[in-house]
A protein has these predicted regions:
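N-terminal domain-start signal
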Residues: 1-355
Length: 355
């Protein structure tokens, strides 16, 4: 009863927002469209994106600008949830916000390291970050090099890990992105132990643990298949956290003498038994499927909990990814059938409890 009282307001809000998510028939329509303008006009009729698209000049109807609209809709949803949240729910949303911050910093790192002639295109994010983050976009967009960028993060939690990398003499984009990822996931792994209810801690542990495990597996696989890296070098790439992988399994995977042996050992782990990796090891796509399953089960079992918030934001992000994918399919001239293969949610290969 206490949870029902605490979450009744925000759960009602989430239910109203969930009703605005695109339905399977919407994806059928998107897949049938021939131009980016067709998709924009279709989204213009939706409640989630219409109010942002109507503010656009039709001369700006192209892929880059519509992707900004999608992100603005996500930020708008976050803002609505924050307004309805109590103090503990706000604390969770503040922690959730860090994923948007990390994405922003990663984008800026890539612009700086690639010496891109394309200027920082972040003005559409500025109002949101000014309100919910210590990161100052108006400073970041003036960064000319990595020293400027790191210094502009001085009043944020990201300064320390990136400053340490700078002082170490590391000089590649990969070094900085790795430092950012290691900091983020290690910090989030600690945050899951915070002052949350037991069921919320369980959900956060399962969701984050699966992400870390699968990200590590993805990096191990790529390091072996594409870069032929040795075990000591692979260890330096990995997040030093295991959830469903034992220490011995983790060691065996890293030290597998070949890609074929890695696949064999992978299929003996929890994830291999659950998802039955075939010849093509598609760990990245499995990651999204696994997290969605965990959050869906958590929400189904405990609708009056943080799962209601986290699952909705996950579904919103997945929706944006699918719309972006539809735009990409148009760019490459894919047929309706081919596009639908990317957009339509695949049948879950694993049911039951996410444990």
């Amino acid at each position: 009863m206490r949870d029902v009282m605490r979450y009744s307001g925000i759960v009602t809000k989430v239910a109203a927002m969930r009703a605005k998510l695109l339905k399977p028939q919407d994806y059928d329509q998107l897949a049938s469209m021939d131009t980016v303008t067709d998709i924009i006009e279709y989204l213009k009729q939706t409640k989630s994106y219409g109010k942002f698209i109507t503010q656009m000049d039709e001369s700006l109807y192209h892929r880059g600008n519509i992707e900004k609209v999608l992100i603005q809709s996500l930020y708008d949803d976050y803002t609505r949830l924050y307004r309805f949240a109590d103090m503990q729910q706000k604390d969770f949303l503040k922690i959730f916000m860090k994923r948007y911050e990390v994405d922003l910093v990663r984008y800026c790192l890539r612009i700086v390291f690639n010496h891109s002639n394309v200027p920082f295109d972040l003005n559409y994010k500025k109002p949101f970050f000014d309100k919910y983050s210590k990161i100052r976009i108006d400073q970041l967009v003036t960064a000319k090099n990595i020293d400027h960028l790191v210094d502009y993060l001085k009043n944020t939690e990201y300064y320390a890990p990136l400053s340490r990398i700078r002082q170490s003499g590391a000089s590649t984009l990969a070094d900085y992105e790795l430092a950012l990822d290691l900091y983020y996931f290690s910090m989030m792994w600690k945050e899951r132990k915070g002052n949350w209810d037991k069921k919320d801690k369980e959900m956060l542990t399962k969701e984050l643990g699966a992400k870390i495990d699968l990200l590590n597996l993805q990096w191990i696989y790529r390091a072996k298949k594409y870069y032929h890296m040795l075990a000591p070098d692979i260890y330096t790439l990995l997040i030093p956290i295991q959830h469903k992988l034992s220490n011995q399994e983790f060691k065996d995977l890293v030290e597998a003498p070949s890609v074929e042996e890695f696949k064999r050992r992978l299929n003996e782990t929890y994830y291999g038994k659950k998802y039955e990796f075939g010849e093509q090891v598609q760990i990245e796509s499995i990651g999204s499927e696994c997290v969605e399953h965990i959050l869906t089960i958590a929400y189904r079992n405990h609708p009056y909990s943080l799962a209601s918030i986290q699952q909705y934001l996950f579904l919103k992000e997945e929706e944006i990814y699918k719309i972006t994918t539809a735009l990409e399919c148009i760019r490459y001239g894919l047929s309706q059938r081919e596009t639908l293969q990317y957009l339509v949610q695949k049948q879950r290969r694993q049911g039951g409890n996410a444990s």
